[in-house]
Amino acid sequence: KLPATNRWGYFPAVSGGWTISEEKFFEPLRDVVTSLKLRASWGQNGSLAALSGYAYSTDMAQGGIYPLVPGNNYTTSVSPSSMGNDKLKWETSEQTDLGIDALLFAGRMNFSMDYFVKKTKDLLVSGTTPSLVIGGTTSPINAGNVSNKGFEFELGWRDNIGDFSYSVRGNLATLKNEVTYLDPSLTRLQGTTFMNVPLTYFEKGYPVYYFRGYQFTGIDPKTGDPTFADLNDSGDLTDDDKMDLGSAIPDFTYGIT
């Protein structure tokens, strides 16, 4: 999937933990805090999932037949069918995680918290501007970097009332997602489309594939047509009037079981 110069990758990882509750100085707290552990990890992984085979190679295909030689003989033409990218390299994700796990009140209550930062570099995407020579075929490219960071919390309680056992558990997670770099040759990349109209975009400073479009302002009482904000006061709706309409990626999620 990659050219020979970038075919191999090295993706290290390391993790460690410290069970503080097993230390001698912690003994006075064990009646309340049954177990307390700190965790930390860092690692990288590589991905080529977005690439098909030989994406770095320009493919040739048989074209039309043309009368280019004497004697009414025809010659078959050959032309590029796809444009390869010989600078492709691994998409790399690097994640740091810091966490704490605790059991309290003889194990009846459990609590955990994690803080994570995940940075994806050299994100592999397609949909870049096609070559005019070979028509609408696009080339994959290591187009940008993405940052994800947030917190994860979980709190639970379990106990018995006579022969009846019960447990309650809740969780909360936050996430900030942002494109932190985009190849200078690109302004934004199109994502999902509907009836050939782009709905989502990949753009620096915004969440991954955020919704970009016109701001609805109401209904024209005379015609019944929808109206939209003319943000640049040009008198017409243009691409410059489109704005950030939000993201499909939630800022936080939660659950109770």
Residue spans of the language-model regions?
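Conserved C-terminal beta-signal and adjacent last beta-strands/turns
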Residues: 167, 247-257
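Basic, gly/Ser/Thr/Pro-rich low-complexity segments located predominantly at protein N termini
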Residues: 22, 48-51, 104, 149, ...
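Extracellular/periplasmic, surface-exposed regions of secreted and cell-surface proteins
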Residues: 1-203
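Intrinsically disordered low-complexity regions specifically enriched for long asparagine
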Residues: 173, 229, 252-256
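Short, hydrophobic/aromatic alpha-helical segments in well-folded domains
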Residues: 84, 99, 240-241, 253-257
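Flexible glycine-rich, low-complexity coil/linker segments exposed to the extracellular/periplasmic environment
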Residues: 63-83, 195-247
